[in-house]
């Protein structure tokens, strides 16, 4: 079977949302051949049973057993990738309907594209704030460039896809980074090739109080600033980044977002 997409999904006691994540993938267009690579950190719940129950003709599944951290888990997963196009999802993310066929068609129609970004919809119980973030990111994403990305990461990880050959060119995820390995990767990618932004909702990001992005908020933003400074030495950009980050942290804290 010729694999179109390899999707890495790190898991750890992920039974609550994993079925929905998997369903959103296997319900894609049946002409798409998918490799699902689960990198499990030692789940004690029903996570592995859920994974083993996948039985789709167009879906190849693999499980990597590890307790080595998220970034290492991603790299180990992508070493197993057989598809032309790569991405990764958290175990509570979801793809939108027709996401993969839209991405595949874009890559095939625009041969020079190295990576593609679509829109992502934040979902959860904070309806107003989710809609505000969705509006903010969607409109800024249309103007994405290196400096804008340096000011703030407006790219939503579940809606990013790249060619396997491009991944080899830019290198694997930095295993010294705990929270923002995706932000570092996007900055490295955009310095090599500008992404194509497509006007489609590609994924859903589930925001809840147990998600990594909800917890460790201050540590996450401190790390993000350090990453940005490695890639962009411009003091004006750095200052704007800091001010915007402080404002975002303030809003997130007072609203418990």
Regions found by a protein language model. Give the residues of each.
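Glycine-rich, basic loop-to-helix element that forms the pyrophosphate-binding segment
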Residues: 65-81
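Short aromatic/hydrophobic "clamp" motif used to bind/position activated sugar donors
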Residues: 86
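Short beta-strand/loop segment that forms part of the nucleotide-sugar
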Residues: 33-42, 63-66
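Short, well-formed alpha-helical segments that are part of the catalytic scaffolds
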Residues: 14-27
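Conserved nucleotide-sugar donor-binding catalytic segment
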Residues: 136-218, 223
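Cell-envelope/extracellular polymer assembly enzymes that use nucleotide-activated donors
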Residues: 3-6, 35, 184
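A conserved acidic beta->alpha catalytic loop
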Residues: 40-49, 90
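Conserved donor NDP-sugar-binding/catalytic core segment of glycosyltransferases
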Residues: 98-131
């Amino acid at each position: 079977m010729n694999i179109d997409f390899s999707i890495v999904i790190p898991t750890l006691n992920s039974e609550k949302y994993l079925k929905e994540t998997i369903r959103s993938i296997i319900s894609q267009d049946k002409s798409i051949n998918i490799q699902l690579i689960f990198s499990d950190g030692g789940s004690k719940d029903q996570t592995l049973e859920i994974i083993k129950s996948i039985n789709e003709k167009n879906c190849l599944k693999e499980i990597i057993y590890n307790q080595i951290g998220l970034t290492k888990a991603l790299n180990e997963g992508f070493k197993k990738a057989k598809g032309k196009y790569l991405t990764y999802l958290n175990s509570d993310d979801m793809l939108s309907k027709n996401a993969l066929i839209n991405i595949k068609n874009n890559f095939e129609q625009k041969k020079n594209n190295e990576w593609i970004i679509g829109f992502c919809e934040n979902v959860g119980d904070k309806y107003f704030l989710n809609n505000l973030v969705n509006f903010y990111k969607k409109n800024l994403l249309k103007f994405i460039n290196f400096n804008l990305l340096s000011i703030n990461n407006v790219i939503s990880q579940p809606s990013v896809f790249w060619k396997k050959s491009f991944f080899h060119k830019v290198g694997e995820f930095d295993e010294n980074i705990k929270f923002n390995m995706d932000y570092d990767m996007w900055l490295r990618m955009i310095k090599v090739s500008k992404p194509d932004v497509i006007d489609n909702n590609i994924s859903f990001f589930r925001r809840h109080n147990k998600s990594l992005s909800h917890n460790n908020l201050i540590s996450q933003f401190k790390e993000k600033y350090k990453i940005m400074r490695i890639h962009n030495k411009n003091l004006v950009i750095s200052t704007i980044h800091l001010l915007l980050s402080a404002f975002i942290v303030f809003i997130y804290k007072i609203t418990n977002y």
